[in-house]
Regions:
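Active-site C-terminal subdomain of aminotransferase-like
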Residues: 1-74
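Conserved C-terminal alpha-helix-loop-beta "cap" of PLP-dependent enzymes
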Residues: 53-127
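Generic structural signal for hydrophobic core residues of well-folded globular domains
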Residues: 35-36, 126-129
Length: 129
């Protein structure tokens, strides 16, 4: 905290100019440099997409439809509201939109840290509905 307003005026600029404050772009660039080294990004995203595909297959087998077809780690699935009530007792999802009086579109998203046993638990829950 700088109490003298005359010193405070250019303080941020002086810190940045003398290397005491890194630019956000540089920090983001370092993250991307690490991700794109030795196929790390492809490796961790492949797991996320594989887990999403496993969910997608189970949802399709259950007869659920999708807001739009995709092959990413995000699934926008249309589910009967009665099923969502049961699913929400054990699992989290993002509400997207109401489709009709009895159905809603929700988003399930997988990531590099998604555990297959958690995906399997969700699949078992859906199969019982």
């Amino acid at each position: 905290m700088i109490k003298n307003p005359e010193l405070a005026q250019d303080f941020r600029y002086l810190i940045k100019q003398n290397g005491g404050m890194l630019a956000k772009g540089r920090l983001l660039g370092l993250q991307f440099a690490a991700l794109f080294t030795d196929g790390l990004y492809q490796e961790i995203s492949a797991h996320a997409i594989a887990m999403a595909e496993k969910l997608r297959e189970a949802f399709t087998a259950k007869g659920y439809t999708y807001l739009a077809p995709n092959r990413t780690n995000q699934i926008f699935v249309i589910v009967p509201d009665a099923h969502l009530a049961k699913i929400s007792e054990q699992f989290e999802y993002s509400y997207d939109q109401r489709i009709d009086a009895a159905h809603s579109c929700v988003r399930f998203c997988t990531g590099w840290a998604t555990k297959e046993e958690n995906v399997d638990a969700l699949i078992r829950c859906v199969e019982k509905l």
